[in-house]
Structure formats: C-alpha cells, structure tokens
Amino acid sequence: MDLELKGKTVFITGSTAGIGFATAKALLSEGASVVLNGRTPASVTTAVKKLEQEFPNESVSGIAADFSLPKEVNSLLENLPKIDILINNVGVYSSGSFFETEDAAWYRQFEVNVMSGVRLSKSLLPRMLTTNWGRILFISSECASLTPPDLIPYSMTKAAVLAVSRGLAQLTKGTDVTVNSVIPGSTLSEGAEQFLEDAAQKEQKTKDQIESAFFTEVRTTSLLQRFAKVEEVAHTITYLASPRSSATNGAAIKVDGVSSGGLF
C-alpha cells in the first residue's frame, strides 16, 4: 500500500533512538522527508548519517534541542522548515519513591513530555489549519493508565498528553487536519534491552527467561507476552501520519497487546 507520504515533511522529537528513530526509518521508506531531533548535536549528527546511508535517495536532516530549556526550544521553532506532520515523541522519566521525588523531577518531566508538544502544536497547527492538511501525533504510554508506583510523575505526563491530543483534535473539526495519540505498551527499546541484560546478569538467567517472567508476573494481561518491537510501533505511527488515516481523528490508538487492560 502506498501511504501517499511523498512530498510530506515530518518533524519527530526525540528521534535519535528507539521508537522515534524506527519511525523515521519507516517514514523515509515511504518517501517522506524527515527532520530528526535529539538533545545534543552529536547524537543528531550520528542518527542523520545512519539514515543517509540507509536511504541515500531520501531527504533527512536534524535539529538539536533540549526541550527542558525554553531558549533552545525557541531557537528550534525559528529554524524549523515547513512541517506537514508533527510527531511528539520526546520523553524523559525518572524512577523512584513518590515520597522522595523532588518537585524539580516533576517539573522537568512535565516540561519535556507535555510542554514540548504543546509549544510545537501551538506553532505548527495554525498553518496546518490554513492549508487544510496536517497530522499531529502524541506518543503516550501504557503508564498513562497502569501508573506504576515508581513512575507516578512520568505516568502523569503520559496521561496529560492524551488530554492535550484530544483537545487539539476538537480544533480541527471539519478540516483535513487530524490529531491523534498512540499508546505503546512495553517496547523493546534500547532502555528495555539494557533492563533485560542487567536483570539477566543479576539473576543469572537468560534474557528470554527474564522477558517471560516479566509478562507472566508483571504484565499479566498482555496478549503478546513479549515486548513489542520498535518497528511494530513505528508502523502504526506511520499509518496515522499518512493521508490514508483521514477518518481517524481524536483517537488514542493502543499498540500494547492489551497490556494496559480495559475493554477499549
């Protein structure tokens, strides 16, 4: 299926690794032009070079910006090219006791995970509405509903982006602009890979044994009974970013194998 993404320019925050990087690859394979983002120039340059080697005939560039620093965000907004599709993927988290987590950790996670998408949407949505076409996607998490007790600040931010996404969708009524969110379940990102390796070494087990135990003991409702691949999440994001998804608006699409539970 041709997703009709040729000629579209996409900006993906937090896209030098993990789901963001996999999404960039999927979009480039469909002929879209992609602008990457990471916190440091070095990480952005490395990611851009990798994609240029894999997709020599496609357009890929990058802009470094730390979304916890408003000055860098303002500079990014000034240097962005015309964007047709915005994917708000950047996210940070810190794990710890609710009683010991300082206010600064709450503020930083909210600033990066929520306000990055708010500021970018405020800047880019008006033009999308004027031209009557655009896509905005917010990448949430199963933590928005599961809320692990050691990830309460992070979970709060991922619930917040669902509200922002749903509210912005209301502003697109009657247009060909859509705003949706994606809710990945446990995904085999670089961080998850490291978790499996560390746990396997600590418990003197194989990574497969650790993964199996995680889903039989922790994510018991998961129908997948495994971590999703970043490519699997990226394929869903790519479809929602395309013109083919024109009837999907204001939705929160789960890619979690029911790990977060619930009938819907």
Model-derived regions: residue spans:
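Conserved glycine-rich cofactor-binding loop
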Residues: 9, 16-18
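Active-site helix of classical SDR
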Residues: 121, 157, 165
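Alpha-helical segment proximal to the catalytic Tyr-Lys
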Residues: 126, 170-171, 246
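Substrate-binding pocket helix/loop in short-chain dehydrogenase/reductase
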Residues: 73, 97-98, 105-110, 218
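Residue(s) in the substrate-gating loop at a strand-loop-helix junction
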Residues: 141
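Short, small/polar-rich loop/turn modules that mediate ligand/substrate recognition or access, typified
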Residues: 173, 178, 248-250
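Short C-terminal tail/terminal secondary-structure segment
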Residues: 146, 237-238, 245, 249-264
